[in-house]
Amino acid sequence: MGWRACLRPEASGAVQGRWLGAVLSGLCLLSALAFLEWLGSPTETAWNAAQGNVDAPDVGGSTPQVPSLLSMLVTRRRRYTLTPARLRWDHFNLTYRILSFPRNLLSPEETRRGLAAAFRMWSDVSPFSFREVAPERPSDLKIGFYPVNHTDCLVSALHHCFDGPTGELAHAFFPPHGGIHFDDSEYWVLGPTRYSWKKGVWLTDLVHVAAHEIGHALGLMHSQQDQALMHLNATLRGWKALSQDELWGLHRLYGCLDRIFVCTSWARKGFCDVRQRLMKRLCPRSCDFCYEFPFPTVATTTSPTRTKTRFVREGRNMTFHCGQKILHKKGKVYWYKDQEPLEFSYPGYLALGEARLSIIANAVNEGTYTCVVRHRQRVLTTYSWRVRVRS
């Protein structure tokens, strides 16, 4: 019941021209199997990095300065995930336009109201602001409600089509593409997702789904925290509010910034202690509420001493095989890129199998790939490949 990802084969307005040819899409919302299963139970540093530090290591920040949070933070593991290339916007004042509206139930005005509510969920807790512009004007984000066959999904293997009612609900593209597509076969409503016995269809909460997809459009992938809005099954579980996990992900991606100019003054007056909820939202930097988990979800690994280097032409598909002869010993395969764990497949970019890893050679995917086969705490074997793309 995982989500698939959409990848735009050509990127315009690219920063770092070579690697944006591989811009990842946001992951897609909900599979039909997940629905059926559920039914069974009725910056400062950010901008420097954005201009070229695409291989910045995924390292946590300093120890938190807030005593009341310390005991919780030192034992938690990082839950949010970012795109492998840490794709992000280079400005906070984003515009959006609505290219088409749903044909079922919601009027254009209701649709606008629902989307605005979803955007407010993010603008209320981040430096981002969102403003709708006319459909004919250029914008950062482009929103539309589309049929099964939409835009280039039939001719592009990297952008899939929708699948009709109650299947995939929506998908979004990572920055700087800005596309957010909703399945027009769904019955969108302003209110909780529920089954309508009168109509015989599922009614889907537009605000909740849109807020999740906006998170992808800002550069966040799925969170592993059960109660996070960016969790894989957030809609199924009914979590509608942004969690601290999303805030840490935004801090990691865009820097931890105060939202108003009086934060320093408020911090001196002791608001960080007596008004923690307000100050976490408005003044995370002045109150030292910024925190990066130093613990990866899977332990990092060092590359083996013997690493094979492969020079390949851009666009070539490559597959690495690992530990096929010893998997009968019940070993488990772990994959890493540049010593950081790979935990998910990204269709059109990277595919993880039990004992193989497939990638498309491009500037984003350059690096050192390592596989480690472990049985409990014992390492059975290790392989490593260094990929370099020919210009």
Curated annotation (Swiss-Prot):
Listed transmembrane segments: 20-38
Propeptide, residue positions: 1-79
Cysteine pairs bridged by disulfides in the record: C256-C290, C263-C283, C272-C287, C322-C371
EC number from the UniProt entry: 3.4.24.-
A Pfam family recorded for this sequence: ShK
Topology term for the membrane: Single-pass type II membrane protein
Expressing tissues: Expressed at the highest levels in ovary and uterus. In ovary expression is strictly confined to granulosa cells of preantral and small antral follicles. Detected also in testis and prostate.
Domain Ig-like C2-type: 296-381
Site-annotated residues for Cleavage: R79, Y80
GO terms, biological process: collagen catabolic process; extracellular matrix organization; proteolysis
Topology Lumenal: residue spans: 39-391
Role description: Protease. May regulate the surface expression of some potassium channels by retaining them in the endoplasmic reticulum.
Protein name, per record: Matrix metalloproteinase-23
Species for this entry: Rattus norvegicus (Rat)
Gene that encodes the chain: Mmp23
